[in-house]
Each structure stands twice: as C-alpha cells, then as structure tokens.
Amino acid sequence: EENADHICKIVELIRKDDKNIPIYVVQTIYQSDQNGIGSMKMNNGSLMFQGQHKSQRDLAVFQLMGYLDEKLSDEKRVYLVPAGISMDSENAFVTEERTVNPYSDKTESVAVDAVHPAAIGYYQIADVIYSTLCGTMGEWE
C-alpha cells in the first residue's frame, strides 16, 4: 500500500503542474521463479529476498495492481499499463545452469537476476506500452 501511495503522489504532483497531460503508470512485473528469487543477492552479498517465497512476491505485485486500479480509476487521462500480466515472467529472465543441490550432478536453469528481465522481457514490456499508447491516444484530444 505504501508503494502505491507513493505512485499516486507522483500522479498528484504531475497533475498540479499540468491538469491535462496523459499519465501512464507501468505496472510492476512478476519476478522470476522461486530459485531465482531465493538466490538473488544484493550488492553487499546478502540475499535480497531472504526467506520469501515467490507466492509472496507475486501477491505483492497483484495487490499493488489492484490498489492502483482502485485509487487511480477515477483519474482523467491516467492509464495503467498492464506489464505485469503481459510479460512472460517464466521465460524472460537471464538464466544460468546450477546444480539442484550441493550433492547432485543434476542441473537446472535458474534466473541470475530475479527482478530485472533480459532484453526479451523488456521488449515485451515495450510492446504493451506501445499497445496501450495506441489504444488511448484518441482520448487525448
């Protein structure tokens, strides 16, 4: 809720400066799989999402989308860009092969960065931004 409130505040501040400018809010994408989330490290080497499950991360993204939809639905010329539900989060991240556990020779593909997609993910996000722009530009006049 706090993140959504900050986004709504940005919209409010833009509106103070220009009451009619179209505002596009690109919704947060879903992160990679559990192994990517569970092993992603911050710059200092500590785990970024220690103890968190993909379902928790997904729920947070889902709730943020719903909250923004509720809070911004009455705003004129504010458009939500559904990047989260339009990007293939299962296949859009850079991966590397890792052993499934320290005692196994079996490997699996694990996301290197669970938050930021590979170029193909950004292309998918760009496509949905472009589609949203094309679908709403007629309302600008």
Stretches with model-predicted labels:
Residues 1, 28-33, 84-90, 115-116:
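Solvent-exposed loop/turn segments at secondary-structure junctions
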Residues 3, 7, 122:
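Aromatic/hydrophobic pocket-lining residues that form the small-molecule binding cavity
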Residues 7-12, 61, 65:
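Generic structural signal for well-ordered alpha-helices
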Residues 16-24, 72-79, 136:
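Loop/turn elements at helix/coil->beta-strand transitions in domains of secreted/extracellular proteins
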Residues 21-27, 78-83, 116, 124-125, ...:
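Structural recognition of the beta-strand scaffold that forms the well-ordered cores
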Residues 31-85, 119-123:
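Substrate-gating cap/lid alpha-helix
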Residues 83-113:
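Mobile gating loops/cap/lid regions near enzyme active sites that modulate substrate access
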Residues 102-141:
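Histidine-centered active-site loop/cap adjacent to the catalytic His
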